[in-house]
Every structure is written in structure tokens, then in C-alpha cells.
């Protein structure tokens, strides 16, 4: 057993959704990294027909709306519910990832207009602060009043110096009032997406330079023989390699040759820290070490599973991908998430510099499709303090397991 933070395969008590469609979309039909669809029934309440009352097959030929007469149905194709055949509502059978990646230009270019999650004002029961004047705005008003009486003051020099010092104070207050980049990302994007979808995708998380350094360190771990076959928590008669085919290493981020991985974790910590208190009743006080994972490209994947099916304390899963020029039609390795109770599948391409966040519990069963090229990812799980403490008491975690949790890094104190 590597760690208590190894994802455990789904047991038979969980409902098994139908398998994915093997048919791939044509290049002209592919969008947002969605290469295949889960054959599942459509919900009439989610789809509004277009003016013609029929959905187009993407080539101008009308077709009737698909109905679920069996447990499997034809895969949805381009044009159905959101292109020329009607409006696609959030989480229609197309993949949550396609709808939560707000920055993607391909989605906007092809006419889909999903309903984006929006924050509510505090007075309406949301978490967004009520609009009010910032401290620097009040300071500027005071300055304006002071300047109106300067002409009547015989001590012009002292008034100018006072105004100058007030201006500096105003600038300082303005800088303090403006939210940081991680805070804006957390409050304006990640928190609404997690509440609305339970899944969040953020592209260009670190940027090409730092992301490239992280990739170089991960490749060095692989070629240095630091990776070991991933293990399962439960003792099963099934060979582990038939369930998961990755090789892993646990990294804290301060080891020699892992500084950039540590920087990645600090960036993720900063975002999650700003999400704390806004994602339900979770009290996030720590996380696991970073799990560096590599699928060697020999056609292995990871069967459908839930990261935390039995309440071991993990509440949020964060995965950072490092695969440049990845093409799922050629390389495979697609991550599929099957949100519980919804007839949808989120198809996530493991693209370079992409951060994926989702709930770790039974709400998000997921699997990694077989990979035919070297596939890298770094995963970290964040703990809910109450559930983690209960798990320690219930399962009497071994000493090796207790040592896995590390505190969420704090921002450096400015000097």
C-alpha cells in the first residue's frame, strides 16, 4: 500500500453506467476536446427545440429528437441541441468540461451559449460581497473635498504636501483592496463551477514557462527510476495492473530537482485557500503530497473508480496535466467523469498546463481510457478536517498513512 490517498476502484454497490461509445467524431465535428459521448437518455427538460422543431445532424439534414428506448442510444453529434437545432443547456450529454471552460474560443465560435454559473450578491443569499465603496474610493472623496479649499488657504506649500501624502495613501489602499489573481480565479470561476457542475477545468494555469519546468522535473523523475507501479488500497484477487496501469511517485516539492513541482503546489494551494469556506461545509486544513503519475503508453489506463468512496477525508481532487501536443484520437488517455445522477459524461483531454478540479467522493466516478503515448499528470487531494479526523478514529490509520497529510502552504510574507 503506497498511501491512504490511493483511489480505490468502485465496488459493485455503485451503479455501473453504460460503457462509452467507441466511435470517434470526425475532425470537423470535434469540439472542446469531446471525442466521444456516453450513450445515455436525453432529458426533455434540458433541451429546447429550435424554431423548426427538429434537430439537425450537422450537415443540414433534419432528424427527429433521439429518445431513449433502451439503455444505449446513438452518440450525439454536432448540431444537436445548441448549434442549428436548438439551445444546449448546461450539462446536456456533451461533457461538463465543454461547458465550464469559459476561456475556450472554440465553444463561442461554434455558437453554443451555455448558461454560465454566476455569483449571487450576499443580500440574495450568495457569497459575493454587497457593492460598496472601497477604502480607496472613500479616501479619494476626502481628498477631493480637501482640494476644494486649497485656494483659500494661505499655506499653499503645506497643502500640496498633504495632498501628495494623501495620494500615496490612496494608491496604497487601492492596491490592498484589489483581489489577487488566485482570489479572482477562485471566487469568480472555480467556486461557481464547483457549485454548479462539481467539475472545473482551467487551461493555461501556470503558463508555458513554469509548466515546461514542471514537465522537465517530472520527466527527470521518470528517467531517474523514481516512479513505482501504482497500488490499490484494498487487497484484491484481481492483478493491480488490470485495474490501474500508472507509475507514481509521491513528492512534497522541496526535494532536489522538484522545486518547480513545489511552485505548482503553491499555486494550487493559493487557489484552494481562497475557495475555503465557500464550498459547502468543508473545512480544508491540509492536503496530500503531490502524486506524480505516468502512464507509459502501452495501452493501459485506470478502470472506473471513486477516489474517496468510504469517507477517508479527501474532498477535492486537483489534477494538473503535462502533455504537450496531445491528440486523444491518436494517443488515447482521455479522462471521463460520470457525475452521479446525471445522464452526462465529462470528457477531459489531458492537455498541457490544464488544471482539473472535482469532488473526490461518490459524486464523480471517473476512469482513464487506455493511453498509447507517455501521459503525465500530477494529482493532489485536499482534506476536510472533520471527515479526516473521523477516518483516523474509525480506521486507526497506520503511521505511514498518518504521515501523508501536509499543511496547505501559506503565501510568502512580503519583505
From Swiss-Prot:
Residues 115-126 have a biased composition (Basic and acidic residues). GO terms for cellular component: cytoplasm; nucleus. Pfam families: 2OG-FeII_Oxy_3. Gene3D superfamilies: q2cbj1_9rhob like domain (2.60.120.620). Residues 1-31, 43-89, 108-179 are annotated as: Disordered. It catalyses: L-prolyl-[protein] + 2-oxoglutarate + O2 = trans-4-hydroxy-L-prolyl-[protein] + succinate + CO2; L-prolyl-[hypoxia-inducible factor alpha subunit] + 2-oxoglutarate + O2 = trans-4-hydroxy-L-prolyl-[hypoxia-inducible factor alpha subunit] + succinate + CO2. Keywords: Dioxygenase, Iron, Metal-binding, Nucleus, Oxidoreductase, Phosphoprotein, Ubl conjugation, Vitamin C. The beta(2)beta(3) 'finger-like' loop domain is important for substrate (HIFs' CODD/NODD) selectivity. Prolyl hydroxylase that mediates hydroxylation of proline residues in target proteins, such as ATF4, IKBKB, CEP192 and HIF1A. Target proteins are preferentially recognized via a LXXLAP motif. Cellular oxygen sensor that catalyzes, under normoxic conditions, the post-translational formation of 4-hydroxyproline in hypoxia-inducible factor (HIF) alpha proteins. Hydroxylates a specific proline found in each of the oxygen-dependent degradation (ODD) domains (N-terminal, NODD, and C-terminal, CODD) of HIF1A. Also hydroxylates HIF2A. Has a preference for the CODD site for both HIF1A and HIF2A. This is Prolyl hydroxylase EGLN2. It comes from Rattus norvegicus (Rat).
Amino acid at each position: 500500500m503506497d498511501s491512504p490517498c490511493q483511489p480505490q476502484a468502485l465496488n459493485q454497490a455503485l451503479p455501473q453506467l453504460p460503457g462509452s461509445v467507441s466511435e470517434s467524431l470526425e475532425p470537423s465535428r470535434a469540439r472542446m476536446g469531446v471525442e466521444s459521448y456516453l450513450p445515455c437518455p436525453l432529458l426533455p427538460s434540458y433541451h429546447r427545440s429550435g424554431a423548426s422543431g427538429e434537430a439537425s445532424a450537422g450537415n443540414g439534414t433534419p432528424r427527429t429528437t433521439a429518445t431513449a428506448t433502451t439503455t444505449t442510444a446513438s452518440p450525439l453529434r454536432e448540431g444537436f441541441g445548441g448549434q442549428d437545432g436548438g439551445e444546449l443547456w448546461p450539462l446536456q450529454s456533451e461533457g461538463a468540461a465543454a461547458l465550464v471552460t469559459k476561456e475556450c474560443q472554440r465553444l463561442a465560435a461554434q455558437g453554443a451559449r451555455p448558461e454560465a454559473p454566476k455569483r449571487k450578491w450576499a443580500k440574495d443569499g450568495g457569497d459575493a460581497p454587497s457593492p460598496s465603496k472601497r477604502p480607496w474610493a472613500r479616501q479619494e472623496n476626502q481628498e477631493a473635498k480637501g482640494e476644494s479649499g486649497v485656494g483659500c488657504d494661505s499655506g499653499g506649500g503645506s497643502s500640496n504636501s498633504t495632498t501628495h501624502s494623501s495620494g500615496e495613501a490612496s494608491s496604497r489602499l487601492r492596491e490592498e483592496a484589489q483581489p489577487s489573481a488566485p482570489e479572482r480565479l477562485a471566487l469568480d470561476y472555480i467556486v461557481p463551477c464547483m457549485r454548479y457542475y462539481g467539475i472545473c477545468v482551467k487551461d493555461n494555469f501556470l503558463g508555458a514557462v513554469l509548466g515546461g519546468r514542471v514537465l522537465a522535473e517530472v520527466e527527470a523523475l521518470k528517467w531517474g527510476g523514481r516512479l513505482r507501479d501504482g497500488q490499490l488500497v484494498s487487497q484484491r484477487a484481481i492483478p493491480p495492473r488490470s485495474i490501474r496501469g500508472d507509475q507514481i511517485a509521491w513528492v512534497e516539492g522541496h526535494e532536489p530537482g522538484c522545486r518547480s513541482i513545489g511552485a505548482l503546489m503553491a499555486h494550487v494551494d493559493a487557489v484552494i485557500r481562497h475557495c475555503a469556506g465557500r464550498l459547502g461545509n468543508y473545512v480544508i486544513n491540509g492536503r496530500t503530497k503531490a502524486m506524480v503519475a505516468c502512464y507509459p503508453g502501452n495501452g493501459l489506463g485506470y478502470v472506473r473508480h471513486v477516489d474517496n468512496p468510504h469517507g477517508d477525508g479527501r474532498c477535492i481532487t486537483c489534477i494538473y496535466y503535462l502533455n504537450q501536443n496531445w491528440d486523444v484520437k491518436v494517443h488515447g488517455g482521455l479522462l471521463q467523469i460520470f457525475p452521479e445522477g446525471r445522464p452526462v459524461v465529462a470528457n477531459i483531454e489531458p492537455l498541457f498546463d490544464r488544471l482539473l478540479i472535482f469532488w473526490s467522493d461518490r459524486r464523480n466516478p471517473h476512469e482513464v481510457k487506455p493511453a498509447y503515448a507517455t501521459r503525465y499528470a500530477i494529482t493532489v487531494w485536499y482534506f476536510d478536517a472533520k471527515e479526516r479526523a473521523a477516518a483516523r478514529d474509525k480506521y486507526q490509520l497506520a503511521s505511514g498513512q498518518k504521515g501523508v497529510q501536509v499543511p496547505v502552504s501559506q503565501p510568502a510574507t512580503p519583505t
